Amino acid sequence: MNKINRVAIIGGTHGNEFTGAFLVKKFQQFPEVIQKPSFETLTILGNPKAFEAGKRYIEKDLNRCFLTESLQNPNLSSYEDIRAKQIAGVLGEENQPKVDVVIDLHSTTANMGLSIILGNQDPFLLKLCAYLSEINPLVKVCYTIPEKGSNFLRSLNKLGFVIEVGAVAQGVLNAELFQKTEQLIYTILDYVEKYNQGNIPKINNLLSLYKFTGTIDYPRNGNGDIQAMIHPDIQFRDYAPLNPGDPLFLTLDGKAIAYEGTSIVYPIFINEAAYYEKGIAMLFTEKQLINFD
């Protein structure tokens, strides 16, 4: 692979996710902390208006506005659609990138710890993630289906990925998570510098990967009203195995609803506040161990 010349760090794609937004503000105030000899690092505050308002978005979810057809559609004129086009103008798109790596910073009310979310299995990303998880076992790596035609910001670039940290409330800064995320970013930038110098650290060629398999909504009645909540046994237990028959939800009158799947899954984004409007109680993943050279 060619040398990496430009890395982009985006925070505040969702305006009420303060960890990434304030890290970008710090990096803009102290740019020397993210600069390396062999490549340039640029920063973008994703959704400035939503950040000022302390809201996830103004009119629509910015992180669902990056479909190629949407970016090329002059009739889409919401604030987030316009902002997506501005960001794509800086970063380029996958077939015409203007940067080499895109790091999109997010936070979650779910207990995701330090998570990396990939949209493809590019060898560079797999080796980076193997390195990160080897030096810090708390780092978990998730993989969604290949995102050709995706509407996520990270899909603008083949080497785009998300850092997702939690649990932290919306519109709140948590110093511990802020510092852990900051250190993770510095480690990534150090890795890129070593990569450019042809001095990639030796790592175990095994990586635990949590592959997205589906979602589940809260139980609802005929009017669409939620009738059950996350069962206490799995609340804040993201990445823990969920076996068939294990309690999944608790109805408003105190009855347990079991997981009816036929195989073990590993739930993530459990009880994410922003997903209530999307009809998602949690995401299901399967745990894989991949071997690469």
Swiss-Prot record:
Alphabetical list of Gene3D superfamilies matching this protein: 2.20.25.160, Zn peptidases
Ligand binding (Zn(2+)): H14, E17, H106
Reaction equation(s) it catalyzes: an N-acyl-L-aspartate + H2O = a carboxylate + L-aspartate
Cofactor(s) this protein requires: Zn(2+)
Binding site for substrate: R56, N63, R64, E164, Y275
Disulphides: none
Claim: Isomerase is one of the keywords in the record: no
Listed EC numbers: 3.5.1.15
GO cellular component: cytosol
Alphabetically ordered keywords of this record: Hydrolase, Metal-binding, Zinc
GO molecular function, one term: hydrolase activity, acting on ester bonds
Entry-linked Pfam families: AstE_AspA_cat, AstE_AspA_hybrid
CC cofactor note: Binds 1 zinc ion per subunit.
Family per record: Belongs to the AspA/AstE family. Aspartoacylase subfamily.
Protein name (Swiss-Prot/TrEMBL): Probable aspartoacylase
